[in-house]
Amino acid sequence: MGKIIGIDLGTTNSCVAVMQGTKPTVIENSEGYRTTPSMVAFTKNGERLVGHAAKRQAITNAENTIFSIKRFMGRKFDEISNEKKIAPYKVTNVNGEARVEIGDKTYSPQEISAMILQKMKQTAEDFLGEKVTEAVITVPAYFNDAQRQATKDAGKIAGLEVKRIINEPTAASLSYGLDTKNENEKVAVFDLGGGTFDISILELGDGVFEVKSTDGDTHLGGDDFDQKIIDFLADEFKKQEGIDLRNDMMALQRLKEAAEKAKVELSSRTDTEINLPFITATQEGPKHLVVNLTRSKFEALCSDLFDSLIAPCKRAIKNSKLKTSEINEVVLVGGSTRIPKVQALVEELFGREPNRSVNPDEVVAVGAAIQGGVLSGDVSDVLLLDVTPLSLGIETLGGVMTKLIEANTTIPSKKQEVFSTAADNQTSVEVHVLQGERPMASDNKTLGRFHLGDIPPAPRGVPQIEVAFDIDSNGILHVSAKDKATGKEQSIRIEASGKLNDAEIEKMKEDAKTHAAEDEKRKEAIDLKNSADALIFSTEKQLGELGDKVPADKKTQLEEALEKLKEAHKSENVETIKPAMDELNTIWNDVASTMYQTPSGDTPPSEPETGASEESKGGDKTQGDGEVDAEYEVIDGNDKDK
């Protein structure tokens, strides 16, 4: 049985881990980083870049660089008005669903997420040296059914069988509590990531991880803090220069990067200077942005965001039926928990200093890997009892939502209830499935609708319709309705907004495979071109060094073959490069044989380097994303993005 990897599919960054024996291991990507930016870019020549390669070119290719796609997952177009405003890429409405438009193509959020998942899958395969087909993927605890389905679809498109969808705070608790299985602890996991906020209260003991309650906000995260700084910088520049930088996509992307950097710096410093030279230009000349931002100003700008963290925490504590004093630890998860004001707020809310023993960027992926180990049998004596974050029910007479499964019910769970008709001789009923906490159906999230027909005519209230809700361990809902008189039953697996049908998923899977093949072909072409480049260089060098020692006829042959290879190299045609390289290498072999037989005693030339190992020869290094980095010398190996 192959390994089940754990993937934290984040709004800003993603991370992949796997169990190695009894220990979880976070896997470095091809660039040497333990987390990968959740970014996808499409270049002018049709190349697709994922992760750091996409991030590096985001400023100059803002309209074709997609980030924070997680915020669009499983949501209708009319639900994403705020997110759409701040995205430099184009988000369009296709039959009520949100789609990203790049050139003449549109992509669903699931497809973009699948590209990120493919990168994580490839990272794991490179590390393990074997194919990976199964994964545990994490989602925010407060994700609804549609968002969970969309995440599962993304996994399918990426070629992964999603063995389990697991809540991020629950995954973090697995990582935190794996070594404390014999202690009875009540733990709050405070998870503030790039795009979402979750708070979960759990009880850990004897290998059982039981979620008591969960709450959160799927529209609150690091992106929102960045946006506050972006708006502040844009407003300041507009006051000074009369130019709104928000109308310039390239300038806006530079503001975004500067805002993120400033936010990070203000976690360890009380002030920072934001200096963006040549941010724009007018007839008078170039304009520069220089603004000093203090930590206190940042906290004032984001005061409403900090306030928004309080209510979910209070609700989660109340629903857990625990007192704040009974909670033993508060574990911080997500990069945004590094903000000092957030840490102070947590300490004030829970009356204790937060626990910083886990890596907030990696702990969720580690927990997902542990759950993968549980499912594959590599990890024993661990039982995970999660909950559904929101109540589930149906619309009944008068437009009221009648709850069948309450929020914070342990999953998997099944509940049945008997309903009847609202009118005389009614022969069919519509089951309108809802998720949320509001009393009126119209104020809650519609998950789906289906009909049960052929009900025998009878007076109102006589037919007995049994509605059953079955929520699985992924938090995904299945609903059935049965006429108890006839035994006729209708059931559905909820297919809500953003849910792709099987045909769409299969098509996207094929597209993903095609892209993977294209990426591999492009990589092979780059490797071959680099090898040709190395052969041209070494041939010219050796011809110069050997001079007249090479027989005249052989020298002519070498020069002719060299010119042929140069022409092929310029054309970038793989079909002509390979034969030209083979011809030149064959002539070099003849030259070496001839010179071995010369009486002069000179050392014959070695066969020129063909670029088979570019790194050792100073050739170009090709990254997994198909991007070629220029030759460079590392000055400070520690200078990495955090």
Curated annotation (Swiss-Prot):
Record field: compositional bias (Basic and acidic residues): 614-624
Comp. bias intervals (Acidic residues): 626-636
Region of interest (Disordered), residue spans: 593-642
Keywords from the named record: ATP-binding, Chaperone, Nucleotide-binding, Phosphoprotein, Stress response
A Pfam family it matches: HSP70
InterPro entries noted in UniProt: ATPase_NBD, Chaperone_DnaK, Heat_shock_70_CS, HSP70_C_sf, HSP70_peptide-bd_sf, Hsp_70_fam
UniProt similarity note: Belongs to the heat shock protein 70 family.
Protein name: Chaperone protein DnaK
Organism: Chlorobium phaeobacteroides (strain BS1)
Lineage: Bacteria, Pseudomonadati, Chlorobiota, Chlorobiia, Chlorobiales
